[in-house]
From Swiss-Prot:
PANTHER family: CYCLIN Y, ISOFORM A
GO MF term list: protein kinase binding
The Cyclin N-terminal domain, residue ranges: 204-286
One matching Pfam family: Cyclin
Similarity remark: Belongs to the cyclin family. Cyclin Y subfamily.
Keywords of this entry: Cyclin
Descriptive protein name: Cyclin-Y-like protein 2
Matching InterPro entries: Cyclin-like_dom, Cyclin-like_sf, Cyclin_PHO80-like, Cyclin_Y
Tagged with keyword Cell wall biogenesis/degradation: no
Keyword check for Mitochondrion: no
Domain of life per record: Eukaryota
Origin species: Macaca fascicularis
SUPFAM superfamilies per record: Cyclin-like
Amino acid sequence: MGNIMTCCVCPRASPELDQHQGSVCPCGSEIYKAAAGDMIAGVPVAAAVEPGEVTFEAGEGLHVHHICEREMPEDIPLESNSSDHPKASTIFLRKSQTDVQEKRKSNYTKHVSTERFTQQYSSCSTIFLDDSTASQPHLTMTLKSVTLAIYYHIKQRDADRSLGIFDERLHPLTREEVLEEYFKYDPEHKFIFRFVRTLFKAIRLTAEFAIVSLIYIERLVSYADIDICPTNWKRIVLGAILLASKVWSDMAVWNEDYCKLFENITVEEMNELERQFLKLINYNIGVTGSVYSRFYFDLRSLAHDNGLYSPVYLLDRERAWKLEAFSRMEQYKVFYSAAKNGSLSAEDLIHLQRAKAILF
């Protein structure tokens, strides 16, 4: 009215997040048997993070990025944390280089080939593929690689800096008394693998959660300026898996469900572990696609350097048809997502119709 102009802006509705109810399948007896001689572990649980308020002014569209779409600013120095910036080298890969170089020197001196004679390579006539991709990593190989990264964190640690919340001597996971001698020796890779594998089997997590857990672990080590050592590695790994499962799982996750997998841990203690872990990483639970990919490929490099290889299969006609089917499914997902958001164009339809299959 008069000389006053008003304008109402109707922002786009933010996409709804579907929450599916579910429960963790407890498998307590397997947890207690996890590490044959090593201490038994616990299971992860996560915390609810209240969404921050989003304010906007007239003329500005409301666009809220999903947590996995948040990219770090470009002005971050390259020497920053690898869990935040994809151009920074991962800590575990740097720590593993000392052992890798020593193995290569030893093999060169003894004239031992580091290549496996049974390893198969692709050619013009035959193509060998493994079942591990960045979007769907091979579970067993990913767990072996992630636990190997944790092993190098422990073995090549600078000191024994730790915090009370992660100290297993102050917060034991079992009721059995543990001798002080146990904490004087670094755990072997196989013990770490059994511990993590048992947790993933009990919680029914996929390989992606292992990679995200490792990202959280390196973020904790960098932010809190601590080391992973024999006294704290189990509770640190537990906290990371717990957080990853609650942040990224489509299923409803409750701390009470995880407590059923332990002999000597209460809901209050689990809540405190989760709370302190979040606080120490500055509540930075976001993982960008570029950081995730960097960790995935560095884990593959780590596995290759240590003689760990995923099983490979010959690309035959049946497997090619399966790959085509998966490709079609992804195309349809993009198609329906675009149609739902009202951004579908005639060009999108043409590209979808012209999608080619794998030919022989």
